[in-house]
């Protein structure tokens, strides 16, 4: 389920069953696996969310996050 006023960036992959609440923003090149994303949450570019995560706060760009509530655990790509 994807609610009203959501913004989803290009090349993002959302696997089912994922629930995205109203006014959530998903950045570019994100990978989201069967998660719950609460309303008015922003997920940064290139973020990856682990299976079954519940996102209640903003997730920065370029991180891998998972859990309930979802927390960043490490950078997705090392900076050059």
Which ranges hold each PLM region?
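Structural signal for interior beta-strand "rungs" in well-ordered beta-sheet cores
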Residues: 1-66, 70-73
């Amino acid at each position: 389920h994807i609610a009203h006023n959501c913004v989803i960036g290009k090349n993002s992959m959302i696997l089912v069953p994922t629930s995205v609440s109203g006014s959530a923003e998903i950045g570019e090149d994100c990978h989201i696996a069967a998660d719950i994303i609460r309303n008015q949450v922003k997920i940064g570019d290139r973020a990856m969310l682990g299976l079954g995560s519940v996102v209640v706060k903003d997730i920065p760009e370029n991180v891998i996050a998972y859990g309930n509530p979802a927390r960043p655990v490490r950078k997705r790509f090392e900076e050059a």
